[in-house]
Each structure stands twice: as structure tokens, then as C-alpha cells.
Amino acid sequence: LVSGGEALYQIVLPPDPDPMEQQAADELETYLAKLSGTAELPKAAETPVTVEIGRAAQNDMLRERASADESGFFIEVRDETVRLAGTSPVATCYAVYDLLEQLGCRWFMPGEIGEAVPRLGQVQLQADSRVELPDFRGRILQSLPRGEASDLWALRNKLGGEVFPGAHSWNRLV
């Protein structure tokens, strides 16, 4: 994806991207630049890799395996194509963050001080094809303060889903 300080990829979004699909693309651009050690990546004259995000990357495997779950996502890296899609716009963000985690990015607490991004210089991906479904419908922290930084941190860590009110929610979980 990145070599010699240049981006070797082109991001493809649907013609009318959802705000979350656009956010997923923006976050991918931002963190690929950070991984490469630059503030902004110039595009190479030739961009051989296509990164399809959201509805631009939807496929039948994702629809079949994750039809009922709004948090499932699909990552496929094959030849010169990377496909990142979710069963919802939020799940599309989960796909991007999962890919970034594979590259070493971590978000330990809200805000820039809580992120850890290795400087790789060169960013390469291994062939991959998988569907991820959360083990729990509800992945929340009730003590997490509300606010833009906390909300973004929660999204980056794939928190969300159904909220189970109260401390005794076992009956709703099973």
C-alpha cells in the first residue's frame, strides 16, 4: 500500500458515500500516512492497488454470513484489490480499524495521547479473506464518558451494539 513514501493505492467509495463510509476512508488515509512516517502521503504516478470501502466492496459472502448482525464485517486482500465492508456503515468502520490493528495500530484511551502507531515506512498486506462477527451483541463500557474523543475511541475499538440496561442482564444475553 505504501512504499518509498508514496501511496500505491486508490480508495474507491460508493457514488453517494454514507458519512461513516467517508469517515472510514479518511481514517484509513490518516493512519496509512502515520504508519509510513509522514503527515500526508503523496500519490504515486501509478496506483496499482484499489481499496474498496463500504458498499463499493459489498459481496455475497458478507451478506450470507452476517445478514442478521449489524456489526459484522468483511476483509479481503487479493491481488491488487483490498475490500473492506460491513453489514452497516458503522461495521464498515470496524473493518478499516481491524485492518489498521493488523498493521499494529492501537487505541488504548481516548485522544491522540492514547494511540500507538508504529512507523513501518513500507506498508504491505498479506492475502486474506475473512468475515468477522462479534461474539456479543452488546460491546459497551457504561463508565465511558460521552464526547467526540470517547465516541471515536469506542468506534476504533469496535465497541457498540445493543445496550443491556441494568447490572443484571444475563437473561437478555442468553
What are these regions (language model features)?
Residues 24-27, 31, 66-174:
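Feature activates predominantly on carbohydrate-active enzymes
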Residues 1-74, 118-131:
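Acidic, contiguous N-terminal accessory segments
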